[in-house]
A protein has these predicted regions:
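Short glycine/proline-centered loop/turn elements that form peptide/ligand docking sites
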Residues: 70, 93-94, 116-117
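Conserved GNAT acetyl-CoA-binding A-motif
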Residues: 70, 77-91
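Conserved beta-strand in the GNAT
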Residues: 27, 34-43, 47-50, 55
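Conserved acetyl-CoA pyrophosphate-binding loop and the N-cap/start of the following alpha-helix
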Residues: 60, 64-72
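A short helix-loop-beta-strand connector motif used in the catalytic cores of GNAT acetyltransferases and
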Residues: 16-27, 31, 83-85
Length: 117
């Protein structure tokens, strides 16, 4: 799913276990089990929650699946976390309008950073 949706590729070793160690996750599957959309939440369970790996198969985009994944993840944070959680994500250009429509705002003057490996 990561590759076909345009996310950075990961190795099998990197893929072994992220769902089990995520605070929450959501998938949308077809009747045949085909993975059409996904997303997950990383967090400490108290205050900080980071939404990551939100992706939709291009063959299933523009059908509301990404929105459904995001709404489910946000609902779970709001429902299960203590009040006033700090929710972040890194919004790639294709998803920014969706994220903004869900209430996300730019975090300026903060800027997301990464450590290349």
């Amino acid at each position: 799913m990561r590759t076909i949706a345009g996310l950075s590729p990961i190795t099998a070793a990197q893929a072994a276990g992220p769902l089990e160690t995520s605070w929450a996750w959501c998938t949308v599957r077809g009747d045949d089990g085909y993975l059409a959309a996904m997303g997950r939440v990383l967090g400490d369970g108290g205050w900080y929650f980071h939404i990551a790996d939100v992706a939709t198969d291009p063959a299933h985009q523009r059908r509301g699946l990404g929105r459904a994944v995001m709404e489910d993840l946000i609902f779970r944070i709001d429902d299960e976390a203590p009040p006033k959680p700090y929710i972040t994500l890194l919004g790639d250009p294709p998803g920014r309008s969706l994220y903004r429509s869900l209430g996300f705002v730019d975090s300026e003057p903060s800027l997301g950073m990464r450590l290349p490996r």
